[in-house]
């Protein structure tokens, strides 16, 4: 007798020739996959019971069915192997893509952190300022020789590196304060480690001084050494240093660097050691030193307004916390109005008609824009006060363009 019962899985039971009649043997056959799915048509249990006389016949029949099933499944097994290999290749490719994307993202993040670490707005100010001062000693297009351009690039590079040193050493010294005032900066946010920042700072300063020494220009070497010392004294927290906590000393540092070092050290370098002419202090140079010094003093006062919260938390008494934000803002705006008024008078006294016109209109326009911008400042909003501070940097850039029309 042959008895079959349908169940949820395939489990044939049969008597083998060497078994006694009436015993049961369970045979579990593997389920096959058809294009990634189970062959549901074979997913049944078969209970096979054989007598002694027909056990051999039943066993052979089951084996024949197994062989037939195996033959029928060969094409599907072949497809299954192909699909498996294809899946492995896809997984490998996906992993490579993920690793490539991850490396690219990390690299771009580090490069952006380095860019922010250099304080690009100050670097742009250095490029504009040094370029403008380098043009002042020129008397004709014949002065624009290949040697002049090479010496200009070397001097500009030394200035940019020193400017970056001053900005980065300030961030290294202010990591904890910047976590409150400027959490987006690389060291404060953790995008760069303090060790990495310190290493970059040292490389910048040493490279800048090395370039200056290679140029063998005493005014340039002197100017960069003064710049280095003042930048260090401004930020480093050592006895008798960290001058940024003192409003007078902080303002003095910025006035000396931007108002004097920029103008006189680099002007004399280009005039005497690049062009080979005797030193002659010109009217535009004196005017540039005066008005840039005023703008620098204003920037030293305004930069503390958005940082007042962090300064108070760490016990620093900035001028805005002593006098009040509104009074400091008013003082800075009035100082710039006075400077632009003087600039208009000086421009009006010029014998160069085009220069007179440009100087009067240009400085009047800057004063008007300053007045409009000052009306929109929200002293209770740090983002607003910082935006106004950045606007003063734009006035700084513009002044280096206008000084060339004062003859």
From Swiss-Prot:
It catalyses: umbelliferone + (2E)-geranyl diphosphate = 8-geranylumbelliferone + diphosphate; esculetin + (2E)-geranyl diphosphate = 8-geranylesculetin + diphosphate. It comes from the Eukaryota. GO terms for molecular function: prenyltransferase activity. InterPro entries: UbiA_prenyltransferase (IPR000537), UbiA_sf (IPR044878). Its EC number is 2.5.1.138. GO terms for cellular component: chloroplast; chloroplast membrane. The chain crosses the membrane at residues 121-141, 184-204, 209-229, 279-299, 328-348, 352-372. Signal peptide: none annotated. Its cofactor is Mg(2+). The keyword Transmembrane applies. Residues 1-81 form a transit peptide. It is an enzyme of class 2 (transferase). Keywords: Chloroplast, Membrane, Plastid, Transferase, Transit peptide, Transmembrane, Transmembrane helix. It is a multi-pass membrane protein. It is found in: Plastid, Chloroplast membrane. Disulfide bonds: none annotated. Belongs to the UbiA prenyltransferase family. Prenyltransferase specific for geranyl diphosphate as prenyl donor and coumarin as prenyl acceptor. Can use umbelliferone and esculetin as substrates, and with a lower activity, 5,7-dihydroxy-coumarin and 5-methoxy-7-hydroxycoumarin. No activity with 5-hydroxy-7-methoxycoumarin, bergaptol, xanthotoxol, p-coumaric acid, caffeic acid, 2,4-dihydroxycinnamic acid, kaempferol, genistein or homogentisate. No activity with dimethylallyl diphosphate, farnesyl diphosphate or geranylgeranyl diphosphate as prenyl donors. This is Coumarin 8-geranyltransferase 1b, chloroplastic. The lineage of its organism: Eukaryota, Viridiplantae, Streptophyta, Embryophyta, Tracheophyta. The gene is Cl-PT1b.
């Amino acid at each position: 007798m042959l008895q079959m019962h349908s169940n949820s899985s395939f489990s044939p039971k049969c008597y083998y020739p060497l078994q006694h009649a009436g015993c049961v043997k369970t045979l579990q056959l593997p389920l096959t996959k058809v294009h990634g799915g189970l062959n549901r048509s074979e997913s049944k249990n078969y209970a096979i019971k054989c007598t002694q006389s027909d056990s051999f016949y039943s066993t052979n029949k089951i084996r024949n069915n197994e062989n037939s099933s195996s033959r029928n499944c060969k094409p599907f097994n072949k497809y299954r192997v192909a699909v498996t290999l294809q899946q492995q290749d896809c997984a490998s490719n996906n992993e490579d893509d993920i690793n490539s994307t991850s490396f690219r993202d990390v690299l771009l993040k580090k490069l952006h952190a380095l860019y922010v670490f250099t304080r690009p707005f100050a670097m742009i100010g250095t490029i504009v300022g040094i370029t403008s001062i380098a043009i002042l000693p020129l008397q004709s297009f014949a002065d624009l020789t290949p040697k002049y351009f090479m010496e200009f690039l070397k001097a500009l590079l030394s200035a940019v590196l020193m400017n970056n040193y001053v900005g980065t050493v300030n961030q290294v010294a202010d990591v904890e304060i910047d976590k409150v005032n400027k959490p987006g900066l690389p060291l404060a946010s953790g995008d760069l480690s303090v060790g990495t920042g310190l290493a970059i700072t040292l490389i910048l300063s040493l490279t800048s001084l090395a370039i200056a020494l290679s140029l063998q220009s005493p005014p340039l070497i002197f100017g960069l050494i003064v710049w280095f010392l003042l930048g260090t004294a401004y930020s480093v927290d050592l006895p008798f240093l960290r001058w940024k906590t003192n409003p007078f000393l902080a303002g003095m540092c910025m006035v000396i660097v931007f108002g004097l070092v920029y103008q006189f050290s680099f002007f004399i370098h280009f005039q005497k050691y690049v062009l080979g002419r005797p030193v002659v202090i010109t009217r535009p140079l004196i005017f540039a030193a005066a008005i840039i010094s005023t703008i620098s003093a204003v920037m030293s006062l305004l930069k503390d307004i958005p940082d007042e919260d962090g300064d108070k938390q760490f016990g620093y008494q900035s001028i805005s916390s002593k006098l009040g934000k509104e009074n400091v803002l008013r003082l800075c705006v009035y100082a710039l109005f006075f400077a632009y008024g003087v600039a208009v008078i000086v421009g009006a006294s010029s014998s160069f008609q085009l220069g007179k016109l440009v100087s009067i209109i240009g400085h009047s326009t800057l004063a008007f824009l300053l007045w409009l911008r000052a009306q929109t400042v929200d002293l209770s909003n740090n983002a607003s006060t910082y935006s106004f501070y950045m606007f003063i940097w734009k006035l700084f850039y513009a002044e280096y363009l206008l000084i060339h029309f004062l003859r």
